[in-house]
């Protein structure tokens, strides 16, 4: 990200056509997009009967935009961050300290800093999700539902399960399914890799 920003600055002086740097982590057009689209879609598809929303943070745009919209509609909706082990955001939400603990094979989510997008999120609490909790979710969905989802989805769904248990029966919990499993073939479906990491392995691998 820093290299991209520096390159954009360098090109501004030499490119007559101008330069566009999306800067998805700190450009709050990201969270605004989710405030204007994803949040309303969730509200509409649940007929406004959503009790909790939980998801991870990469850029922070999704959880910031969705949480801002849902909290405007109903301040009692619970918003939780689902954070992979090794990320600093769980401790930031729960303890006010940017401190990562553990590690994860999950890619693309979690962070060691608070992005401009994430800073706008309206979050009630956070869950720290280890691989031993998220991977079985992924494997179960492949085997039982025919859904081939990636590691970010595993973290999100594991968080949704936790929030469901926390809020109790009869609640509507929403999360985001944001990646496919084929992006992680060398990890998710590699028995040797999983054995070396001491991670859960389904019988069918």
Regions found by a protein language model. Name each.
Residues 1, 5, 11, 18, ...:
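Active-site/ligand-binding loops adjacent to catalytic centers
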Residues 2-24, 148-151, 155-172:
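Structural signature of the thiamine diphosphate
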Residues 15-58, 66-68, 120-124, 128-147:
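Active-site/ligand-binding-proximal alpha/beta "capping" segment
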Residues 22-25, 56, 81-83, 174-178:
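Short beta-strand segments
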Residues 32-36, 64-69, 90-94, 185-189:
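Short acidic, glycine/serine/threonine-rich loops at helix termini
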Residues 56-67, 89, 152-160:
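Short glycine/serine/threonine-rich phosphate/pyrophosphate-binding segments
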Residues 67-74, 164:
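Surface-exposed amphipathic alpha-helices with a cationic face
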Residues 158-205:
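Phosphate-binding loop/pocket of nucleotide- and phosphate-handling active sites
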């Amino acid at each position: 990200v820093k290299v991209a920003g520096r390159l954009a600055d360098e090109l501004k002086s030499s490119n007559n056509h101008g330069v566009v740097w999306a800067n998805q982590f700190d450009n709050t057009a990201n969270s605004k997009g989710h405030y204007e689209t994803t949040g309303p879609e969730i509200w509409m598809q649940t007929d406004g009967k959503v009790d909790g929303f939980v998801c991870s943070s990469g850029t922070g745009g999704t959880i910031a935009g969705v949480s801002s919209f849902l909290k405007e509609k109903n301040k009692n909706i619970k918003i939780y961050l689902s954070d992979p082990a090794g990320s600093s955001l769980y401790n930031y939400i729960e303890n006010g300290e940017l401190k990562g603990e553990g590690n994860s094979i999950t890619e693309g989510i979690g962070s060691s800093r608070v992005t401009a997008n994430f800073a706008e999120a309206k979050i009630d609490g956070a869950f720290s999700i280890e691989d031993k909790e998220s991977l079985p979710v992924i494997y179960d969905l492949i085997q039982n539902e025919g859904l081939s989802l990636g590691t970010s989805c595993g973290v999100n769904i594991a968080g949704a399960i936790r929030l469901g248990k926390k809020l109790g029966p009869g609640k509507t919990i929403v999360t985001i399914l944001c990646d496919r499993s084929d992006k992680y073939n060398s990890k998710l479906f590699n028995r040797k890799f999983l054995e070396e990491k001491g991670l859960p392995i389904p019988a069918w691998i």
